Amino acid sequence: MMKSMHDTHNTQQPAIPGYLIFMLALTAGMAVASLYYCQPLLALLGNDFHLNSATVGTLPTLTQAGYALGLMLLIPLGDKFDRRHVILVKGLALATALAFTAVSPGLALVLVASFIVGITATMAQDVIPAAAAMTDSSQRGRVVGQVMTGLLTGILLSRVISGFIGEWFGWRSVYLAAAAAMLLVTILLWRALPRFTPASTLSVGELYRSMFSLLATHAKLQKAAVAQGLLNAAFSAFWTTLALMLYQNFHLGSSAAGLFGLAGAVGALTAPFFGKAADRFGPQRMTRIGALLTGVSFLLMLFAGSAINTTWYLPILAVLTVSFDMGVQMCLISHQTIIYNTAPHAMSRANAILLAGVFIGMTSGSLVASQLFSHWGWQAVIAFATLVSALALLLRLLPERRTMISDTVI
């Protein structure tokens, strides 16, 4: 019989085994990767179902919308119920939704399945607090950082994997392989995960209501959610339309779009250093540096657009992909540091609010970018990304408002 996890504030935790850290990082990466498999496959899906770029662009939009909904409705339940049960149920549901996507005969069913994929992929955000709960406070930052590296790597390598598999075996093979892998890792977690004692005694209704109170009384949380949402709108706009641009301008397949995921993976691999930098120089300063790096990267992409049909454009684009992704990830980790310090007794709910802002931004970015690309092309998408990045920087430069602290929301 597995033992329950005790309150880490009151009890010294044994060291979490290295294999379990690796498994949790792998799970977080695989779950969140499910959101992005479709992006390098859009041209293949469009050809298969005979759809234009604007219509097929609704696929990542619905997936991100499902994720945002799941963040708001399901992530807070990790404070109320045993996280082991929550993770395992979501793992089975995600594997089922991925398999259903693979066998769907038409776009309508693919869209429904993708929406469910988005909802259940939120298990990635259940894994992170689970890792924290199993770790003593003196080691928690290191362990959570390792799991976050797995999550961020999953986001970017998902495009590489789906791009190559889609190019050689078709888009349905991507989802079949993902479903099988998700089922396998869920079985392994069933064997390895301990039980967790729920952290909150609030009812489900009170738990949800407390999130509104948390957001209303913490100005820093509001600012973090909006600023990161703007940055991720730029992030999503770029990745949603990249495969379409490469196909139309360079006649390159999904594997080429996937290769850009390797360039972006550099940002994920540097994530642990951003947390240390936020501790050393302050998270506020790091959000400003990250937003500036993101905005400048997109501005340079805009200027480079005049050379879009030359051999120099793709290498320049690859370098700027690395830099803008580093900026977005730098801001995300720094914003997490800010909200955890702002609401230390409600980290799961604060994290849910921040990430809901992130993926509302990503949903909006996908939708806007699909329409911009369809009507005005790639340069319009990059102009949009530059604009929203500049707005995020402006927001981070504004002076901080005094936060109204309220412990009654806990």
Language model features with spans:
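Intracellular juxtamembrane helix-capping segments at the cytosolic ends
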Residues: 123-135, 328-343
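Helix-loop-helix hairpin linking two adjacent transmembrane segments in secondary transporters
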Residues: 109, 146-193
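Helix-to-loop junctions at the C-terminal end of transmembrane segments
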Residues: 71-82, 270-283, 373
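C-terminal transmembrane helical hairpin of 12-TM major facilitator-type secondary transporters
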Residues: 285-334
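Juxtamembrane intracellular "pre-TM" segments in multi-pass secondary transporters
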Residues: 6-14, 193-226
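Conserved MFS/SLC helix-loop-helix module at the cytosolic interface between two early adjacent transmembrane helices
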Residues: 69-107
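Cytoplasmic helix-loop-helix junction between adjacent transmembrane helices
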Residues: 113-151
